[in-house]
From Swiss-Prot:
PANTHER family in alphabetical order: 1-D-DEOXYXYLULOSE 5-PHOSPHATE SYNTHASE-RELATED, 1-DEOXY-D-XYLULOSE-5-PHOSPHATE SYNTHASE, CHLOROPLASTIC
Main EC class the enzyme belongs to: transferase
Note on cofactor: Binds 1 Mg(2+) ion per subunit.
Annotated protein name in UniProt: 1-deoxy-D-xylulose-5-phosphate synthase
Entry annotated with the keyword Ribonucleoprotein: no
Lineage of producing organism: Bacteria, Bacillati, Actinomycetota, Actinomycetes, Mycobacteriales
Entry-linked SUPFAM superfamilies: Thiamin diphosphate-binding fold (THDP-binding) (SSF52518), TK C-terminal domain-like (SSF52922)
Function in brief: Catalyzes the acyloin condensation reaction between C atoms 2 and 3 of pyruvate and glyceraldehyde 3-phosphate to yield 1-deoxy-D-xylulose-5-phosphate (DXP).
Reported cofactor(s): Mg(2+); thiamine diphosphate
Species whose genome carries this gene: Corynebacterium efficiens (strain DSM 44549 / YS-314 / AJ 12310 / JCM 11189 / NBRC 100395)
EC number from the UniProt entry: 2.2.1.7
Pathway the protein contributes to: Metabolic intermediate biosynthesis; 1-deoxy-D-xylulose 5-phosphate biosynthesis; 1-deoxy-D-xylulose 5-phosphate from D-glyceraldehyde 3-phosphate and pyruvate: step 1/1
Amino acid sequence: MGILNSISTPADLKALAEEDLEVLAGEIRSFLVDKVAATGGHLGPNLGVVELTIGLHRVFDSPREPIIFDTSHQSYVHKILTGRGDAFDTLRQKGGLSGYTSRAESEHDWTESSHASAALSYADGMSKAFQLDGDTNRNVVAVVGDGALTGGMCWEALNNIAAGKDRNVVVVVNDNGRSYSPTIGGFAENLAQLRMEPFYDRVMEQGKSTLKSMGWVGERTFEALHAFKEGVKSTVIPTEMFPELGMKYIGPVNGHDQKAVDNALAYARDFKGPIIVHVVTEKGRGYAPAERDLDELMHATGVMDPRTGIPVAASKPGWTAAFSEELVKLGGRREDIVAITAAMAGPTGLAKFAANFPSRFYDVGIAEQHALTSAAGLALAGKHPVVAIYSTFLNRAFDQLLMDVALLNLPVTVVLDRSGVTGSDGASHNGVWDLALTSIVPGIRVAAPRDEDTLRELLGEAVDINDGPSVVRFPKGDLPAPIEAIETLEDGVDILAYLEASPASEDAPDLLIVAVGERATLALELGERLVAAGANVTVVDPRWVIPIPQSLVALAADHDLVITIEDGVIHGGVGSLLSDALNAAEVDTPRRQVAVPQKFLDHASRGQVLLDHDLDIDSVEKTALGWMDRLFGGGN
């Protein structure tokens, strides 16, 4: 790592001789493989942008000239070149480097949201601010790719950027044909055609040389052919796509030819006005295991053997796999079921459905808003759509869920993977808002399975709903041990345990613990501990948590304290809804909530995040005993 060890700032990079850059690129790739193998992270995207990121920091004056990485999972090389290489052993760990850009880490990081398609809007606003300040020689660079240009927000931003003819916005399209998997849609097809241009031009040049070597006849033939050259070319290569937006376009540029990248970026730097630089890169470049992973090119990995790319720990049965398998079964029984993903068929478990029912599967690109309203259209025409997305990305499509689906009482099922605390991907990837968001949607039903069996049951029940939207939410990771109900009430609420105080006492308070989804495991353990502290405990799982089942209100009226345990934010979730329902029924039973605090959570492992916010079993027990002591004077 000889050259890499000498780089701690972009100024060091600019001082390098051109002949050193190829060696540096190789060192960076080796560094990435070694470090990401030890911590997990986004490997494939970063292997693909090594030369591009070197070029960006050689050509532009960061941080004075902001370089904004859309989504920013491909910002590892940027972090290395701005002095954070020594901290890569802490990537995605508590107190360590974020897996995305982070304003707290470096002045070179201007933004930190990891949701796609936002960089161009940031750039538009920043360039307007620079213009207002009279700072006309300051570029703003937005690097967008990995499928993000399939998001509508990018095109809204481009429309505004193009209108600012005297604003220096450099849009770098990192075109690797991928998001998690091959990018889908008309825009992706246009980029694929643009990638044909170097080949086309080589053929035309060869033809030109051949014809001109034939003398007068060849010259006349070339002139005749040249007359319709552009017409033919436009039918093959849609080079007008970006210029028709009113923006200068250069490319495609080989993203792994350092000199070509540097020259293109230097041209863009000196161009006065908005400009697009189209750079073609290869995701996973230089690492054989990634290049062999044709489905995802090692977009994201866990801890692995750097020599082979094989995970260190064997994967266990997970929530996503169980959902995937059950949806295929349902799809086999019902031809009206269709599935929609927003560029994440593999991560959300829809790849198997797509393989079994390709005509009933739709990948809409990184376009959650469109996904929900397209699903509404499918429902209007008699289908039952299942939209599978990460919980955090429902935030982007809330208006569509509310106004395009729920207002019309349409039977659309939204499956939310990665609900609750996800951990290492940080603040913007936690799925802690979905319960609060969906709680205000009229007519919606929200299910939270506690284990594999209830996931399968609730998914089947959800697709049977035909008079409004339904949501099934589950967390990231391995499935917990199955939990059998000892009784099921008429409205579907499962009684998981009746636990009597030990020793038995007529004075023992009666506690009702309401567990939301996978928090049932913790709720049962809490119940056992509170029994030992002198309480009678009933543990229930509502299964369908929104709206609040009436049997919960009745149960609450018969208890001395109600404790809800959920993995969403404390305001607006199941605990809040239950409290409202008790107030409406004039039930005065005290109620308390164990939930995620109303704040953005720093990245760390899921277990560490829960521990840091008193959501682990020991902390919850301590909290509950405090409540008991204050209410009943009997907690130990």
